């Protein structure tokens, strides 16, 4: 994966609120993450939200954050998304973007 000069690797946790379970949200999130070349994970929570972690170049992570806030899967209805624990990382902790059961 080639990175633009100065495109720092970052890690950020996310949680998406709204109608995001039972609408293939995790599958679409995984596909979008892979398309952008990001790594991390996504899972459903007992509270009816979807949460996970994104890692990759800052510009790609920003694109994915916007996607999580505004797009999601076709049948989802996103109320809001929260992002926490953003930090610069020296290397990726994952080799893939996974759906966690």
Curated annotation (Swiss-Prot):
Stored PANTHER family: ACYLPHOSPHATASE, ACYLPHOSPHATASE-1
Key words, A-Z: Acetylation, Hydrolase
Family per similarity comment: Belongs to the acylphosphatase family.
| N-acetylserine: residues carrying this PTM | 2
* Active-site residues, Swiss-Prot/TrEMBL: 26, 44
InterPro entries, sorted: Acylphosphatase, Acylphosphatase-like_dom, Acylphosphatase-like_dom_sf, Acylphosphatase_CS
Pfam families of this UniProt entry?
Acylphosphatase (PF00708)
Reactions accelerated catalytically:
an acyl phosphate + H2O = a carboxylate + phosphate + H(+)
- Could you say which enzyme class this protein belongs to? hydrolase
Residue ranges constituting the Acylphosphatase-like domain according to the UniProt record = 11-101
Q: In which tissues is it expressed?
A: Organ-common type isozyme is found in many different tissues.
Annotated Gene Ontology MF terms? acylphosphatase activity
User: Which Enzyme Commission numbers does its entry carry?
Assistant: 3.6.1.7
Q: What species is this protein from?
A: Sus scrofa (Pig)
Which protein is depicted?
A: Acylphosphatase-1
Q: Tell me if Hydrolase is a UniProt keyword of this record.
A: yes
The organism's superkingdom is given as: Eukaryota
